[in-house]
């Protein structure tokens, strides 16, 4: 956990003192793992918080240049590493995840300032969680697609995971 946030913090520190990263997760355990990596890598421009993404942090509204929304998903892109995922998937569970993702997106999209970037990512290959959600963000939350969506499909025996990322600009 925290790989995208840590990478963002490292990239920012390479460019000088140009900002800070707030890495949040609902799980104490995952935040502790992120903290271990931050300490190991001696990163100073990142702060971790145990935080429920469904709770709006009023102090961050319209403040962020970039928000990376790496949301809970069905994980269908990592089924090669976690084959038990296929036994837990159902149309109802998938729809429930889409609903949760959209509820979180309604909150975190508010943190992005006008002209800022929302990076939406998942580790699934499910269209409803990916392209459909990204299109919904543009239609319902006032964002514009910036380039093409990127979907990586896991290839047979490649060891690669499937994932999705969309770069969206706030109007």
What positions do the PLM features span?
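Conserved hydrophobic residues forming the short capping helix/wall of the S-adenosyl-L-methionine
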Residues: 12, 38-39, 138-141
């Amino acid at each position: 956990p925290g790989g995208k946030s840590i990478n963002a913090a490292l990239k920012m520190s390479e460019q000088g003192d140009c900002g800070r990263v707030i890495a949040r997760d609902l799980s104490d355990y995952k935040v502790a793992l992120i903290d271990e990596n931050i300490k190991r890598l001696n990163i100073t421009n990142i702060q971790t918080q145990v935080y429920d993404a469904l709770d709006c942090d009023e102090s961050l509204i319209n403040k962020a240049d970039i928000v990376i929304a790496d949301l809970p998903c069905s994980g269908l892109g990592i089924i090669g590493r976690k084959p038990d995922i296929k036994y837990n998937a159902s149309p109802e569970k998938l729809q429930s995840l889409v609903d949760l993702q959209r509820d979180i997106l309604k909150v975190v999209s508010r943190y992005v300032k006008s002209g800022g970037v929302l990076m939406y990512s998942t580790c699934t290959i499910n269209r409803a969680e990916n392209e459909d959600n990204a299109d919904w963000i543009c239609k319902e939350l006032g964002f514009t697609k910036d380039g093409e969506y990127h979907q990586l499909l896991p290839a047979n025996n490649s060891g690669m995971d499937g994932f999705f990322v969309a770069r969206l600009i706030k109007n």
